[in-house]
């Protein structure tokens, strides 16, 4: 097994320079073997910018494309529900079940990719404690 190179401390000058250089490069482009729909590209950009550039590997980028698509599908389903309502012909709109499944899939993918709120911001008790300081 190939050892993973040790990362620089987040509070080091080298890490700060790397972060600035990575931010200047903008979002990572999808690899050739990954398809990201045009309408999902802003979602892709937000996802890949949520983690340091040097932490992404090809397997993660594949999952990131699935997450961007799930977010795009969720927006489409929400618009459909807004247009047609939660109830259609006295039954629950089938789009509601699809939206629920897409949301669950997106949450699982976000956790797996470590781009969820707990991974990027911290636990809610820590956020609450930090906001009390402001």
Spans of features found by a protein language model:
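Arg/Lys-rich, low-complexity, intrinsically disordered N-terminal tails that contact nucleic acids
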Residues: 1-45, 119-134
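Non-transmembrane, interaction-prone segments in cytosolic or luminal domains
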Residues: 27, 34-43, 58-60, 89, ...
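An amphipathic, hydrophobic-aromatic interaction surface with interspersed Lys/Arg
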Residues: 30-84
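Amphipathic alpha-helical protein-protein interaction segments
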Residues: 65-128, 132-134
């Amino acid at each position: 097994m190939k050892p993973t190179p040790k990362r620089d401390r987040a509070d080091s000058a080298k890490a700060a320079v790397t972060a600035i250089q990575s931010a200047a490069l903008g979002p990572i482009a999808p690899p050739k073997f990954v398809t990201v729909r045009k309408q999902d590209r802003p979602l892709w950009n937000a996802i890949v910018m949520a983690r340091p550039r040097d932490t992404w590997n090809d397997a993660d980028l594949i999952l990131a494309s699935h997450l961007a698509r799930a977010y795009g599908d969720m927006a489409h389903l929400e618009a459909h529900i807004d247009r047609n309502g939660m109830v259609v012909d006295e039954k629950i709109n089938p789009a509601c079940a699809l939206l629920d499944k897409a949301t669950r899939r997106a949450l699982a993918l976000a956790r797996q990719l470590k781009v969820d709120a707990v991974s990027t911001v911290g636990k809610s008790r820590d956020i609450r404690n930090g906001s009390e300081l402001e």
